[in-house]
Amino acid sequence: MNKVIYLDNAATTKVAGEVVEAMIPYFTENYGNPSSVYSFASKNKEAITTQREVIADALGAKANEIYFTAGGSESDNWALKATAEAYKNKGNHIITTKIEHHAILHTAEYLEKNGFEVTYLDVDENGMVRLEDLQAAIRPTTILISIMYANNEIGTIEPIKEIGAIAKEHGILFHTDAVQAFGQVPINVDECNIDMLSASGHKLNGPKGIGFLYIRKGVKIRSFVHGGGQERKRRAGTENVPGIIGMGTATARAIRTMEERTTKEAKLRDYLISRVLEEVPYTKLNGHPEKRLPNNANFSFRFIEGESLLIMLDMKGICASSGSACTSGSLDPSHVLLAIGLPHEIAHGSLRLTLSEETTKEEVDYVIESIKEIVTKLRNMSPLYEDFVKKTQK
């Protein structure tokens, strides 16, 4: 197979054709600054309002609760830092988990250095938060719970509705990083008692460099970027109009196609998982076997290095990942895989495959055969595997 097979859609996605078409006029024709008073620019202000409404509808929110940002990392930083600053007179304790994206973990570490206390919850072997652990971690000084909707590496979907209920019961703000979940699973902020939610355009066939933070009306969150009065004086800077158009168009498309698209993805994902587990010995599926994103499969292969597997897959035209794209250059094993209890040597042999609506069965079959061939080759070169075989033959 000579073409590239892209199975790293958790890292980023191809921008959909209709999204590109919707964006182009805002580069070439409707390029006015939305803050300007003349009618040429006011069209852009109206366009932003329309896309804000589209995104709000997708969440069951109000348009004035959607704030555009440069992406998921900014939204996460804003949610944690600005909440901590606004509510520091009420308390200084934040609860999150050990499997969050680094945009949350590193922000939490920053806050710890600035006088806040952070509890990092353990998860079970499937990456699921234990609700009793969350209850036990709550203190009188707890001001924020931040737990991701679905994990970017192993695909586990957290019990968000139950977490939201616990937060509401104790009068604590609840933020969720929904960068991987938005557009892949239905989300309703009221049903789940979500006070803040982060999302990003490039994870749902939209452009890079655009995202949003949902902030429930009444939440006292401080401005994150100071300057002009954009985003209702909470996030200064001339709006990225083409990006906002792309984000809104991608959101509408994701909601419109969700049922058919995710059903197809889940069917192929299950086929991929079943064949790999059956045909590649000493392989483990990471993440919840059922409560997981429809396009995510994450495996650990014993006796091999994940980086070697990735390089050899790349030579066959297959794009995959050993974990988060934000940490793929690191030689350390995934913090997520360590958090679910995998030993270092097994965590090192991980592979994440994330499908798209364009992924075909023919491509999946080719990937499976390639994995079988490469894993066999790498194991035959492994002293650890050789020792294991000798011991089992005694």
Model-predicted segments: where are they?
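Pyridoxal 5′-phosphate
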Residues: 1-394
